[in-house]
């Protein structure tokens, strides 16, 4: 299965028509909203499958009262981070602008761009080049003496000039601009580029009208090789000192239409025009919603204003970067600063489009990617979405990740995409698209395994090869409501399956209270048959092999699982089963067997069933509650996992069994040091602390006794080698140290029967000479799915190497 949040870059650019300037005041026409989807290659294997990468490019329309705004346009590349089978990505936008200032407009002052030449578009898109830049690398020599200054107007209109370098000179500071200054990125001319006089003049005009500068000039200096060095000298625009800062969300506000000023207006009419613009802007921002920016960032920006003095272009750029960095760090990947207003009024108003969600769209795709009618009911998917992803909320990348995890947990889809895109009907807002590819409803699977049984003389023959395995079938998503019917059949010998045939058939019915009910309960009904080797009848150290006892269980089970949260669930139900104990010859046996000193086998061992006949039937209630707060840090699990289970006999069945069997398991995964999280980063060392208690009050058949020893109990011992008891306690500690690609670990464990072995019928612990308690220690290494470890048990004082599948905890 592949699930992904499509990595999007929401790349907004403001496109305006040529502006007109009168008395340092600029008017622009509104821009249009366009969204373009284009794929970009990307591949991420952070312990999960590769994800499909896409890019969203969008033009965000923003406009305000023309005389009192500072427009920001541009692009910010901030992709969603990927993770483990559930890749989440998003992009953010940035702002830019241009404009001018007005001394007669009161609250006026702003930057606007003309002819797509805004300063912020340039500074945020450094790879941009002049549209009609010639592709040819041929260029002409200036044919002038070296080291002389040439004004732009003195260049020939018929030549193509090579620009060797570009220098920015700040007239206010009377110094060259440092290489790290963002002003160097705003010009579209590039060192080594070839340009005509018309292109250079167009660049100068674009810089002069962007509102960034009070004055800007361009001149060249001749080089001996025929190329030109370009110097751009400028005086930065400045506004009045400000001591107040306000941030507003304009994402869902209707964009105002700017009114062009008549160039033939009298001075009195111009003043009145500016005042109307100011009143309109104040009315507009008074109805705006406050942005999500916290008070701490507000205070930080106020300190920036106090330290700076007069408001400058560089200061507004720093404010924009600080505001947007907070949004993107908090996961609001579609948020962007689009406007600064109220300049020259001692208050800077920052307008932000935060990415308000106006619509949720769920689409089902076929194998070719075409939109089709899905089998899954819409509410099944919708109930898995966090509320932060619903209309009326602000899009957040973490909500997108959570949606992926939740939808993936349904196990109904082969591919999942969460894709935020601009809403063309509501400027500045977001539509969340969820695209799903459904799995086939019916599936069947066969897994095989071969075993070799020694023949005569101990040598295997071709006839001794036994083909075994499991056949599984599933019909999922019945009626589109995620109901399923699954079945499996397992045997170690398909040629003679009656010896150990095991099966399970289960029907799952989620949303027991209705798909629209927030209560999350699932009903499961199953019938089963299984056979397992009983660890109760196992010899202790130095005891010859004890004849095996097999326990067959067949019955039905019905339970309800209620998920309180993603971390906590409660399961309760009824179990009715028949238990039959058999010896190695597959005969029903009522007692365990033991080897006598003369080598003979005696059948007078501990009783195997409660009834004494080898066959028990019983019914009991079962309930367990689990709380799992674990998570992965660079592939290593940390957190805690706790489980409590109770089985309550009802007095129904053989000998009217009435009992209470209970278990408590507590496991802590303690992170020993902080590490940087991300793909390819090293995992932290972890200390694992584990405790398990089991106890029983009332009737206790031997097959339900608690056993000690084995790969999932006390390591270093065989299954049940320490003892079988009515009450047990296990304690374990393990420290995991990461190494390249895996981890090594050391452990120590102890298990005790708390003196309760004698309370089990027939006392199998004493009969088979087991100690009733034991400790072990050792070390190991994780090799893929295999644990390779060396363990020493204290009861015998010997050690051995073990290879185990799966995890101990």
UniProtKB/Swiss-Prot annotation:
Membrane topology (Cytoplasmic): 153-160, 235-247, 366-410, 437-442, 474-500, 562-569, 694-705, 784-797
Distribution of this protein across tissues and organs: Mostly expressed in young leaves, also present in old leaves, roots and stems (at protein level).
Pfam families listed in its UniProt record: Omp85, POTRA1_3_Toc75, POTRA2_Toc75
Disulfide bonds: none
Amino acid composition bias (Polar residues), ranges on this chain: 1-17
Any one GO biological process: intracellular protein transport
Region of interest (Disordered), ranges: 1-44
GO CC entries: chloroplast outer membrane
Keyword entries, A-Z: Chloroplast, Membrane, Plastid, Plastid outer membrane, Protein transport, Transit peptide, Transmembrane, Transmembrane beta strand, Transport
Chloroplast intermembrane topological domain residue ranges: 132-143, 170-225, 255-357, 419-427, 453-464, 510-553, 578-684, 715-776, 806-809
Any GO molecular function: protein-transporting ATPase activity
Documented effect of changing residue 129 to G: Reduction of processed protein by 90%
Record-linked Gene3D superfamilies: membrane protein fhac, membrane protein fhac: a member of the omp85/tpsb transporter family
Location(s), subcellular: Plastid, Chloroplast outer membrane
FT transit peptide: 1-35, 36-131
InterPro entries (UniProt xref): Bac_surfAg_D15, D15-like, IAP75
Transmembrane segments: 144-152, 161-169, 226-234, 248-254, 358-365, 411-418, 428-436, 443-452, 465-473, 501-509, 554-561, 570-577, 685-693, 706-714, 777-783, 798-805
Membrane topology category: Multi-pass membrane protein
UniProt family annotation: Belongs to the TOC75 family.
Comment block on domains: Transmembrane regions consist mainly of membrane-spanning sided beta-sheets, which are not predicted by sequence analysis tools.
Function: Mediates the insertion of proteins targeted to the outer membrane of chloroplasts. Required for the import of protein precursors into chloroplasts. Forms the voltage-dependent preprotein translocation channels (hydrophilic beta barrel) of the TOC complex in the chloroplastic outer membrane. The narrowest inner diameter of this channel is approximately 14 Angstroms.
Name by which UniProt lists this protein: Protein TOC75, chloroplastic
Native source species: Pisum sativum (Garden pea)
Gene behind this protein: TOC75
